[in-house]
Amino acid sequence: MSEPKVRRWVGKYEVGRLIGECNFGKLRSAVDTETGDPVALMILDKDKVLKHKMAEQIKREISIMKLINHPNVVQLYEVLASKAKIYIVLEFISGGKLFDKIKNDGRMNEDEAQRYFQQLINAVDYCHSRGVYHRDLKPENLLLDAQENLKVAEFGLIALSQQAGGDGLRHTACGNPDYAAPEVLNDQGYDGAKADLWSCGVILFVLLAGYLPFEDSSLTTLYKKISSADFSCPPWLSSGVKNLIVRILDPNPMTRITIPEILEDVWFKKDYKPAVFEEKKEANLADVEAVFKDSEEGRVQLRSFPCVICSGGTTCGDVRSRTKLMNGLIERGRPQEAHSIFNTLIEEGHKPSLITYTTLVTALTRQKHFHSLLSLISKVEKNGLKPDTILFNAIINASSESGNLDQAMKIFEKMKESGCKPTASTFNTLIKGYGKIGKLEESSRLLDMMLRDEMLQPNDRTCNILVQAWCNQRKIEEAWNIVYKMQSYGVKPDVVTFNTLAKAYARIGSTCTAEDMIIPRMLHNKVKPNVRTCGTIVNGYCEEGKMEEALRFFYRMKELGVHPNLFVFNSLIKGFLNINDMDGVGEVVDLMEEFGVKPDVVTFSTLMNAWSSVGDMKRCEEIYTDMLEGGIDPDIHAFSILAKGYARAGEPEKAEQILNQMRKFGVRPNVVIYTQIISGWCSAGEMKKAMQVYKKMCGIVGLSPNLTTYETLIWGFGEAKQPWKAEELLKDMEGKNVVPTRKTMQLIADGWKSIGVSNSNDANTLGSSFSTSSKLNIPNNIASSRSPLFLKGMPEKPKLCIKSQFGLRQTLLVVLCRDQIGEAGRFCKFM
């Protein structure tokens, strides 16, 4: 057995995993072995610091942090040094960056943003009172502890008040321009306190809006916007916070609000709690110089050895606690971090337990890292552990998830050879795996093995897995045979079984069979239909265009004791839209209000798509506005509908503006939306702008174009009588690993034909000539027909005249598209 990797120590601190890196060193986690408390250890390379003449800045940073003792500022505990390294021991902050919280969760409500802003002002006010100015405040430099309290970090750019010029102003520009005050960018000297306050205002705006107040791809334009405070607050902010933001983001530092004035602001004072802490006495800064002295005094020694407890065959506390942490991270959707913790355990010389290995398998499965699963069993055995049933089941499940059933069966056989008895869960996993890849005969063989060889009783999960597998193959009769077979073993079908069968009937266009057969059998077996059962049947009728049947069953739901949910109403709306019956849509939305079901983004998107498809972007915009006023954030699908609609309506500039809207709501554009915008510009004959969008997508955004993107551009160049440019795109396609099809080549050929070239040799000659000659007068902006991307399946405009408007009442969508309908409407006959 190979020797475990050593554990490293700096003084009393046991060094852990790498957290981050910079030009001059690394940041690692560590543990104070005397107290057991976690710390962060900044390890700086002394030679690099001296070589780059950074010694004074490092001394200044240490001096500043020694001056500060505040609950909302990262604390410095101790500074140590060896001959080659400087060790700065800092408070360990476990909650991550405020920037990541905004990126992952989006904008905050005012109460949450207010709490963070109050803590930020507390910290900044304290630092300013000590003569310390940050000058680089931004969400990336604000950390959150385990209780989600804010901690200001990153003191590398701080300037002490003693370093001001003769005019009392600072003259060193630093920090992120997005958060920098106008006077900092203008480099005319500035007051550090007022500059920090501007940054606080930008941070408050970002917390509440989810995007920056000043944005532009051009740095010159961005500076102009910042210098003139050219921004607007989003409509959802209260007047109190709007007024405060405007007073903070005052471009004139002389009239800008001050911290004492902020502390008296009505919005700020709500639930305000001043920081409580013990004031630090004047720090002794004399020892800071000793950090760079080349003497043996005070140097720390590194020591290393494997974990004694683990080597003795007992699981140590570190392994137990970190395994628990791994489980927590996996549950929160962070398997990569769990995997990293496992690697750290190995690096530190610990011996993981079987539970730790099982947790690792779960993390690998979530990350879809399946290649090392088979070798994992050998590693467990080499560590002197015997794999148990739980570990085998986890590895079999991972192999099955990857689609590698051969590997799963090898592990299954190894499981039996090792003396571990397979469980019902083992067989269910294998049966499901073979069912997913369509090998149902193998699933049946495993069921027989389960019953015959292992004497195991199948359960309801076994039944549902097999029923689902046969239904996926559209072999409903075989699925029923499974139900009957399971009943003979005492396994009764449950609501999941019947829902699967109902969905299978609806999928083949036999929703009436689903209703006539499934519902009676459910009631006979004393299985209560749920909203999913009813939703499947309603949606099935809607998909088949049988709206009267859908409505009839909608009212039958009351008899079954099932309350309709949003899926049911969205299905009805979509069904009526598919047959161009806007009156039906209006009454369904009224029913939503009657049943107390609020619309969601799918509801709005469905209605937006209906109007967008017929070219009525005004109606589409009205619904979009209603959605925003109702407090519902649009998703990628809603934005895609807008972009596609504008492009199809010949308004590509509006389609491109959608990208700004998406950024405000924290929605990342995908290749589909960019392709729709490109298609709009191609249809307008604006190939230069189409290529600008294409380059932005590939370069700045980092998205990979797909075949549709390239074929849209090729079609556009063909319509613009520039087929040589279309042909040049083939090189881009090769570079992006996008394989052209017969259709791609036909589009290029059509482009050449449009300028009278049908021979490939002539095309090559002309292409070379066009790309090198400036004398040929070929217009770039030629009026063209719509792109093929938007001609597919365009519905005819509905004949019904819509007289009413879309609007909101009490945050519910109230669409009132009645056109000569009675008071009760057509639904009265079903009441």
Curated annotation (Swiss-Prot):
* MF (Gene Ontology): ATP binding; mRNA binding; protein kinase activity
Read off the InterPro entries from this record.
Answer: Kinase-like_dom_sf, Pentatricopeptide_rpt, Prot_kinase_dom, Ser/Thr_kinase_AS, TPR-like_helical_dom_sf
Q: Kindly give the SUPFAM superfamilies that the UniProt entry links to this protein.
A: Protein kinase-like (PK-like)
The leader peptide range reads none
Residue ranges crossing the lipid bilayer per the database entry: none
GO annotation, cellular component aspect:
plastid
Query: Which Pfam families does the UniProt record give?
Result: Pkinase, PPR_2, PPR_3
In the UniProt record, does the keyword Repeat occur?
Answer: yes
Q: Outline the extent of the Protein kinase domain.
A: 13-268
State the PPR repeat positions.
Answer: 318-352, 353-387, 388-422, 423-457, 459-493, 494-529, 530-564, 565-599, 600-634, 635-669, 670-705, 706-740
User: Carries keyword DNA damage?
Assistant: no
Q: Which UniProt keywords apply?
A: Repeat
Domain observations: The protein kinase domain is predicted to be catalytically inactive.
Classification via PANTHER family: OS01G0228400 PROTEIN (PTHR47931:SF2)
Similarity-based family = In the N-terminal section; belongs to the protein kinase superfamily. Ser/Thr protein kinase family. In the C-terminal section; belongs to the PPR family. P subfamily.
What name appears for this protein in its UniProt entry? Answer: Pentatricopeptide repeat-containing protein At5g21222
- Organism, by scientific name, is Arabidopsis thaliana
